[in-house]
């Protein structure tokens, strides 16, 4: 439901879309566990070599980056669209249990490793969407990933509205 608007618009443009349901959704086994499940899902749906554009939302952005940078997904992904991802962590991760929450704390080993291996994304077009009004990713500027040449502050009122935000969807569809 969260990606319904975006998927409908992309399908109307002739794109095939998949929305994997990675479990556990709270990431209690860690970001790497979910990234491995993403890789398996992609390989099953598309085969091991077919290129595809990747869209991530929130924790899914960090899962996607782990897939791209650590599991070598970058070799087949020409474009990554990161929607409200805590690229520099979120303070709210201190309030939640589980390895995934620890992975998303500012300065975590996982986020530090992703920062140090950003060069692996040199062939991937990076597009970032964030809202300065985000109250889930604290501070909100953690979503404004400076590595990306294309960064859009949509001013959406809530974090959860970002994947359906009209400006975000329109920008992704036109790329």
Predicted regions span which residues?
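Serine-dependent carboxylesterase/thioesterase catalytic core
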Residues: 1, 5, 13-20, 28-125, ...
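A short, mixed-charge helix-start or loop-turn motif at secondary-structure junctions
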Residues: 20-24, 154
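C-terminal catalytic-base region of ester-bond hydrolases, centering on the histidine
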Residues: 122-175
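Active-site loop signature of alpha/beta-hydrolase-fold enzymes
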Residues: 25, 88, 160
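Rossmann-fold NAD(P)-dependent oxidoreductase module
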Residues: 9
């Amino acid at each position: 439901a969260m990606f319904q608007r975006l998927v409908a618009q992309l399908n109307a443009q002739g794109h095939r879309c998949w929305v994997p349901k990675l479990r556990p959704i709270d990431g209690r086994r860690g970001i790497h566990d979910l990234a491995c499940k993403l890789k398996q899902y992609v390989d099953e749906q598309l085969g091991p070599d077919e290129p595809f554009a990747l869209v991530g939302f929130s924790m899914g952005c960090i899962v996607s980056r782990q897939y791209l940078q650590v599991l070598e997904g970058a070799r087949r992904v020409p474009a990554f669209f990161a929607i409200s991802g805590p690229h520099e962590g979120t303070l709210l991760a201190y309030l939640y249990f589980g390895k995934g929450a620890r992975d998303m704390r500012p300065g975590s080993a996982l986020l530090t490793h992703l920062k140090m291996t950003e060069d692996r994304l040199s062939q991937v077009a990076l597009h970032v969407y964030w809202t300065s009004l985000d109250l889930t990713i604290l501070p909100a500027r953690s979503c404004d990933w400076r590595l990306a040449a294309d960064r859009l502050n949509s001013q959406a009122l809530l974090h959860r509205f970002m994947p359906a935000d009209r400006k975000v969807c329109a920008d992704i569809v036109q790329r």
